[in-house]
């Protein structure tokens, strides 16, 4: 992964004063990397600042690795639009990047009449969203598709698939890098300041770094290592998007953290499951524990969901893991404890109604009072599926 070897900067009191960029993207998760790749198509000088030492160290890699169909998301929302678009184009994207992907399809299984009605409701919603090919199947057909699925009936979603979200993010970032984007790791953003042209602050900036023209307003983005300058700043900081957004001048967006735990099953179990098996959505359209094969031959069982306050609260809880076993066995009856080889945690930061906690849509915010800034907040599931369509929307604002 490229980290600019020649930072072309001046140094003052131990702080590196960077060259000027057209665009700075904050965050090298899957969405930030997709934005960087999209912007690399244009004649823009772009940098990505990431607080960790590699891409996708946060929740971009702490998920099921599912290419979602888009049938549970509310019609007309950004989440629904980008999920369906991202799904439809993913074969092409995966081929361009050379990353592993299998369009396996997915079974959404049910046990009760209530499950059946919920599945039918979300099937109709998916069709309205543009999801193609969904069909209801009885137990016999369900077991022809996946012999080891639990359930009495199912909806088959042929457009769903599986991928490695870490390799996918690496592919996006490497492609951006090959096209000239600079990635700076270990670069935690500590401050963002707008500097107007023809002001004392701009004069001081030019004095510190004479390569700056000073003919247009700039943003000074300070990290623990250096000061970066750019005409545009894009916030794609994931769990820290609210914090970065407030540094930029955006108001706080009400959110809650939703923590989910997973079991990873040995590849010996992988031979028994070739297609993801999900439970019927609940009344709100959310899923609980499901069983999903990985592109490497393991199986992921999870997640459960409970609230958390910590953006990096990745500790497991025994009671949650016990529940995963019980719930996961309903989806995948061949699951057994000897297959468990490790566990991990992911966290969704959901935009929500501050009173009811109703989950709200993805946000791509702009503000006329903070020109040349874009703030993406609450990009949780299906963020991996939606990453490239989100990136196109960001580029359309900027260009």
Where are these regions (language model features)?
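N-terminal Rossmann-like FAD-binding beta1-loop-alpha1 element of flavoenzymes
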Residues: 21-48
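Glycine-rich phosphate/pyrophosphate-binding beta-alpha loops
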Residues: 72, 160-162, 282, 286, ...
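Active-site substrate-recognition segment that forms the wall
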Residues: 37-38, 97-102, 227, 235-371
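C-terminal lid/capping helical subdomain adjacent to the catalytic/cofactor pocket in oxidative enzymes
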Residues: 14, 34, 362-399
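Short beta-strand to alpha-helix junction loop
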Residues: 79-84, 109-118, 156-174, 184, ...
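Helical element adjacent to the flavin cofactor pocket in flavoenzyme catalytic cores
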Residues: 155-231, 388
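Glycine-rich FAD pyrophosphate-binding loop
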Residues: 41-61
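Dinucleotide-binding Rossmann-like beta1-alpha1 core, especially the glycine-rich loop
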Residues: 65-145, 151, 288-290
